[in-house]
């Protein structure tokens, strides 16, 4: 992996991780365009730079993270469903992750769903709740389990979950960001621990990992601010059309037998 490739992948990670557009789908397209082949270090790199994205949430919402213990208890309750389902379905999840057809199909279907989300939950903006209860947090965590299917988008699943519990778009999006911290931290830490031998053997590539995290951190902060602004003003429809276009593009490329891989 070159320095330029690491920067571009980190930018893609930072932009897409917290938007309801599926970071996995974008990594597939980006890697195909740049000719990046799947290898052990590339997989470790894409996992490791998620730490930078996670940190951006903590920095942006610093006061919320250190406000009260109740905040952490709610995140813990919301994290429980994902932890349980993740442990039970790990082998199946690993298999799904290798299937680009699954990613393309879920991108397309998820995009169609997003086209109707604003209409379904229109009253939330005037009558919705701003505070997340324990029950709401748990149910959002259940929705997050859907994101284990590649292409669904963790952000899209959890925000829609929040909307079903009568949260405003902003409140649902922010709790989605908060829930990403324990969820992504646990998944990333576990993946890196499993690859600890490879990391120890690749000390010469540590600068690439550090650069990737810095870039992902900066870009993710900007993406979160952009997303909240767009979401509160215009809703989900634009993201829906974008997902449909991306999913269709992936399906066309697959039909043309273009070599696409989940790197």
Swiss-Prot record:
It comes from the Bacteria. The keyword Cell inner membrane applies. It is a multi-pass membrane protein. The chain crosses the membrane at residues 1-21, 41-61, 69-89, 97-117, 132-152, 172-192, 208-228, 238-258. It is found in: Cell inner membrane. GO terms for cellular component: plasma membrane. The keyword S-adenosyl-L-methionine does not apply. Its EC number is 3.6.1.27. Keywords: Antibiotic resistance, Cell inner membrane, Cell membrane, Cell shape, Cell wall biogenesis/degradation, Hydrolase, Membrane, Peptidoglycan synthesis, Transmembrane, Transmembrane helix. It holds the Pfam family BacA. It is an enzyme of class 3 (hydrolase). GO terms for biological process: cell wall organization; peptidoglycan biosynthetic process; regulation of cell shape; response to antibiotic. It catalyses: di-trans,octa-cis-undecaprenyl diphosphate + H2O = di-trans,octa-cis-undecaprenyl phosphate + phosphate + H(+). Its main location: membrane. GO terms for molecular function: undecaprenyl-diphosphatase activity. Belongs to the UppP family. Catalyzes the dephosphorylation of undecaprenyl diphosphate (UPP). Confers resistance to bacitracin. NCBIfam families: PRK00281.1-2, PRK00281.1-4, undec_PP_bacA. Bacitracin is thought to be involved in the inhibition of peptidoglycan synthesis by sequestering undecaprenyl diphosphate, thereby reducing the pool of lipid carrier available. This is Undecaprenyl-diphosphatase. It comes from Cytophaga hutchinsonii (strain ATCC 33406 / DSM 1761 / CIP 103989 / NBRC 15051 / NCIMB 9469 / D465). The lineage of its organism: Bacteria, Pseudomonadati, Bacteroidota, Cytophagia, Cytophagales. The gene is uppP.
